[in-house]
UniProtKB/Swiss-Prot annotation:
Keyword check for Zinc-finger: no
Highest rank taxon of the organism: Bacteria
Reaction(s) catalysed (UniProt annotation): RNA(n+1) + phosphate = RNA(n) + a ribonucleoside 5'-diphosphate
Organism per entry: Helicobacter pylori (strain J99 / ATCC 700824) (Campylobacter pylori J99)
InterPro entries registered for this protein in UniProt: ExoRNase_PH_dom1, ExoRNase_PH_dom2, ExoRNase_PH_dom2_sf, KH_dom, KH_dom_type_1, KH_dom_type_1_sf, NA-bd_OB-fold, PNPase
Family: Belongs to the polyribonucleotide nucleotidyltransferase family.
Signal peptide from the UniProt entry: none
A GO-annotated cellular component: cytosol
Keywords: Cytoplasm, Magnesium, Metal-binding, Nucleotidyltransferase, RNA-binding, Transferase
UniProt protein name: Polyribonucleotide nucleotidyltransferase
Gene Ontology molecular function, alphabetical: 3'-5'-RNA exonuclease activity; magnesium ion binding; polyribonucleotide nucleotidyltransferase activity; RNA binding
Lineage: Bacteria, Pseudomonadati, Campylobacterota, Epsilonproteobacteria, Campylobacterales
Amino acid sequence: MDFITINSGNRTEEFALKQVAKQATSSLMYRLGKTLILASVCVEREPVSEDFLPLVVQFLEKSYAAGKIPGGFVKREGRAQDFEILTSRLIDRTLRPLFPKDYRYPTQITLMVLNHDIENDLQVSALNAASATLFLAHIAPIKSVSACRIARVDNEFIINPSASLLNQSSLDLFVSGTKESLNMIEMRSLGQKLNALEEPLMLEALELAQKSLKETCALYEEAFTPYQNELLFKEGEGIVLNERLLDLLKNQYFDEIIKGIESSALSERENVFKEVAKKISEAHSEFSLEEIELSLEKVKKTEIRRMIIQDKIRPDKRALEEVRPISIESNLLPMAHSSILFTRGQTQSLVVGVLGMDNDAQTHENLEHKAPIKERFMFHYNFPPFCVGEASSIGATSRRELGHGNLAKRALETSIKNKEQVIRLVSEILESNGSSSMASVCAGSLALYASGVEIHDLVAGVAMGMVSERQDHAILSDISGLEDAEGDMDFKIAGNLEGITAMQMDTKMSGIQLEVLYQALLQAKRARKHILKIMHEAKEKIVINFSHLPQTEIFNVAPDKIIEIIGQGGRVIKEIVEKFEVKIDLNTPSGEVKIMGNKERVLKTKEFILNYLHSLDQELEQYAIDEVLEAQVKRIVDFGAFLSLPKGGEGLLRKQNMDKCQVILKEGDSIRCRVISFNKGKIALDLA
């Protein structure tokens, strides 16, 4: 067993090698303070034949890591929680670009949290543990990567803040990369205000992150290189294509290839290339269909990149900074509290907004928080197969859908003034040709306004792309699906005119230089300005239907009266909710009653509750201590019997009082009883 200690900045990381999980290709135990993560890499020795990278990353939290038993009916960890899925994606998106293009060995990276101190950053720790384990596995010539988080407190940037400091921050910036460049970014603004970060400040934060990553990666490579396994996979030359077939495609079928490139819809484009491949296969039997399809893909990609780099023209004839045409419609769904249909080119998002009560908030349990937390602002993103012309079933929420919804949520969260409101936005992607998550942000911002939610400002989103060839590169605004597939970068940026509220950057290269990222940030600001102008024009035309929006009425009663509103087994409150068609939240310690629904019904509900409590008080006032009554047994319970009293109301005859007189009662019996006390609005009885 070997121990390696890395001191970088304000962190001391410890790595125990060959201690546990020794049958894995490589494994280690990572420690940062009281946080322990078991990281392992397992590789199959037989490559797959399909043309994709068979990489799976799983980040797993164990409740015992924080000294907890899982909540819910089943007391064991079940399906992955949102935080686990999002962290798995974070690690996957960092590591995937580092693999050689022709790597085909099934590889699984597992991160298991065994112990956790909530002051430590689990995502940074997990990514660093994964990076170290992958570097030690030496399954391919993969560079060392690391991660850091940047916060901003009192206008000062802080590297790898504690959880306490992050709670005070106006910025949450997660960056990962190699010694040379950055290859993954996640950012969101934090706080009660919008806290959009200006582009020059964002560059400053990224420079600070890159400096930290450069130092950490250098330390990792120096420390871990002596312990690497023997290299499993040497990077080859890739697939060698037939030059004669390539020439044939360029000379005889080039016009048809261009037609396919210019087809805007994914399904239409795929059909064009299938027809071309079939046509060539029939005319030239010496080439296999697979060979033809690979060559077609090569010619298509080369031509798209040439058009963009040299001609400065995109496949759909747009200029590099041109945003697709935008249209916005509102109030399409009369029963929802808001609905916005945002269309940008062939990407269309229908965002529906619904307001709720405290008990509508989503409750989460994870290791990052001591107690369950309530998610009051929810953004759910759905990507049905028909939006890209596919005929397949709609299943469970995918990792991608969860990630896109989380990005849109982060973009809009700080724009909401009242953070106590419970809001659910749902984005239904009805048509997709790139940038659907950013269309969701635009529609979502307008849906908040249309729901009557007070916002600091509208927020717009745009996806930026890049095509790079040697020393030349071109930045693209509002990328289409084809440009995303054939380009080198997907950089989603959301914000207002002043700055950025959220962003997410992924790359297919080993990394992106800072000057390129800054160019993309400035170009995105120009695109955002154009989109926000259209959104503000649409906002002026939105008619908020306040009569349809739910109204909230809050009032207080004596805390001991809350149980009366609930009633035996919840009977009273159920009847009230069904009768008036409202939602009710009750706070027993404070006596607060919150009613939400149609304004007229809310007021009638409040009146009913107050009158009901008053009538109970009046019933109590009719009786005196030691008064003897003739009562009727209403219902029998485990702890006694509830009796219907002659002047109205009911009282409780406890079981012990019945037992001492050896009385056996049944419902409907009449019995003489005596009032012995009043307690919290209840009448206690004894046998007379």
